[in-house]
Amino acid sequence: VRAIRDATIAEHAAIKQYETVADSTNHAKAKAVLQDIANEEKAHVGELQKLLSLLDPQEDESLAEGKEEVKEAGLICISKLFLN
């Protein structure tokens, strides 16, 4: 389970790297390719998250609790926090 968590962290780091490079270029094709790669890494995160759910049943419970806490705090749309 720890190795899967580490792999998830690595995928998030890769996403950040590809998106940072994509944001830094004005070359439309390069930007599109880099964003596509970042999106593939996001799919990997989803695969790893599903694997964690299978290996650690408490994972889903913890995620559900976290979502509920955000909902209760009135922060249903987290992205609004970062756009203001």
Predicted regions and their residues:
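Iron-associated oxidoreductase/ferritin-like identity signal
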Residues: 1-84
